[in-house]
From Swiss-Prot, chains A, B:
Expression (tissue specificity): Predominantly in developing fruit.
Keyword Repeat attributed: yes
Domain description: A pair of annexin repeats may form one binding site for calcium and phospholipid.
Signal peptide bounds: none
Pfam family, one: Annexin
Annexin repeats: from-to residues: 10-81, 82-153, 165-236, 240-311
Binding-site residues for Ca(2+) 1, renumbered to this chain: 25, 27, 67
Lineage, opening ranks: Eukaryota, Viridiplantae, Streptophyta, Embryophyta, Tracheophyta
SMART domains given in the database record: ANX
GO molecular function: calcium ion binding; calcium-dependent phospholipid binding; phosphatidylserine binding
Name of the protein in question: Annexin-like protein RJ4
Binding site for Ca(2+) 3: 298
Length: 314, 314
């Protein structure tokens, strides 16, 4: 379930006019921007951008970028983008800066449905005139490259059939590789990057039943270099995205100084999807409501915007 | 240019009725089947199958399969399929039988446009409840697997921009790998499987200008194990599909006993696309018209059907 609160009825033209006043008037009216954009779903934001473009011959993103600043600007800008295009931007920034590249690429590859991942690949090409795998492969090396490129180019079967025999044999293959510390074993990459999510779930369950320990825990027990961490992230994203995002939020908030990039990423990308469920998991694990934790670690317009996306009533 | 001759006006229902008579009457009327299906394009065949299904509650493919036989049956059956579905069948047969797997997978991966390749991947999933990369990865190993999976999962940028600097540096990378006989070098696979076709063309041209020999010739000069052959095929398919298909036809016909599978594959898959151009290349290289060579090597209904697809007037 989503946290975003958006009105069933809205007028794109009125919103565009109100936003124009907010960015072009005497001083920027951040509150108005938050109260409009923070309450519009992807389809509505798209209509608002189109209306704004038609009225003022300018992309709404331009004044948002120039009039706002810092984490608030980044959050509003990313939120306003079309979701697939936003993921393309996130992927490109991660690849170019080589920061968080594993996490961002793995999230996009392993959490999205096959069709959603494809939409991101399309959006990436439209925006950057390259394929995402092309840029990713050119900016990474070795085993990590093999894993990430295989994951991002996957177009998994999306059906719900389970082949129990296969789950059995591939749970063994995974365990043998982990036992032998052959983490970069081609078979691990093959299985994680080609099997359907339903099939993988069955394989991971079989692994846990056979070994008495989950594959993700087993992986980390054996130490954790970058490649193992990436594998671990992929398995978590494939297996239980909500639990995974809870952990990302927890780490982002716990860190001295707060990891705003991760915080913004999770809230902006999940607000229209499953942020309500992630909030629940967060509360169970931390005994503190997510809103409260976010409010404590952030401030000003950035805080107000994140809390709005988190479903706070105005 | 295509060789297929199909009427602008046709009636799917009439065709379906005529085909019904041809397969269900006293003795099968192969000539009628050839004269109808051999003159209908993909859209028309689709309509005929739909009309047949509606009239007789049966897929037209069923009687075609049961009433026809041998190479003729295979050719008519594959021709009647929707093109993306046909490629899915070709890929699956190649993967399962491990025959011609390199050629078929590389053709589909490197000759199709990114969207066409995607359509084949979708058709494959619909038909087999697996992804093509999943089956391919499970049935191959080692370097060949790396290459084929990377090619079949590609969703290349389809634009026409060329980055000359990149072509320069990647021509060098390719040459260094070939010079060192490091054919399985990850960089070769990365470049071939991620760069756009336009960019690759520029890279191959730069290679030829720098080295005085084309990359495909250079590859074969260094000996030819299976992996090198697969690389060679991929480069030819990316670079000049018509020349590549001419060679496939030449080899299929020259072989003692004729390679009907390859012959059928090229004619059936290219008749609505560029078979006229391939015929021209064939004539230039062999001084014998392709129709004549095919007629000499085949017989009966199979021969009549292939010649019809090759554009022979009735």
């Amino acid at each position: 379930m989503a946290t975003l609160v958006s009105p069933p009825n809205f007028c794109a033209k009125e919103d565009a006019e109100a936003l124009r006043k907010s960015v072009k008037g005497w001083g920027t009216n951040e509150k108005a921007i938050i109260s409009i954009l923070g309450h519009r779903n992807a389809g509505q934001r798209k209509e608002i951008r189109a209306a704004y473009e038609q009225l003022y011959q300018e992309d709404l993103l331009k004044p948002l970028e120039s009039e706002l600043s810092g984490d608030f600007e980044k959050a509003v800008y990313r939120w306003t983008l079309d979701p697939a295009d936003r993921d393309a931007v996130l992927a490109n920034v991660a690849i170019k800066k080589s920061t968080d590249v594993y996490n961002v690429i793995i999230e996009i590859s392993c959490i999205h449905s096959p069709e959603e991942l494809l939409a991101v690949r399309r959006a990436y090409q439209l925006r950057y005139k390259h394929s995402v795998e092309e840029d990713l492969a050119a900016h990474t090396t070795g085993d990590i490259r093999k894993l990430l490129v295989a994951l991002v180019t996957a177009y998994r079967y999306d059906g719900h059939e389970i082949n129990a025999k296969l789950a059995n044999s591939e749970a063994d293959i995974l365990h043998d590789a982990i036992k032998d510390k052959a983490f970069n074993h081609e078979e691990i990459i093959r299985i994680l990057s080609t099997r359907s999510k339903t099939q993988l779930m069955a394989t991971f369950n079989k692994y846990r039943d056979d070994q008495g320990i989950s594959i993700s825990k087993n992986l980390l027990e054996e130490g954790a270099n970058d490649f193992q961490k990436a594998l671990h992230t992929a398995i978590r994203c494939l297996n239980d995205p909500k639990k995974y995002f809870e952990k990302v939020l927890r780490n982002a908030i716990k860190r001295v100084g707060t990891d705003e990039d991760a915080l913004t990423r999770v809230i902006v990308t999940r607000a229209e999807r499953d942020l309500r469920d992630i909030k629940e998991v967060y509360y169970k694990k931390n005994s503190v409501p997510l809103e409260q934790a976010v409010a404590k670690d952030t401030s000003g317009d950035y805080k107000a915007f994140l809390l709005t996306l988190l479903g706070k009533e105005d």
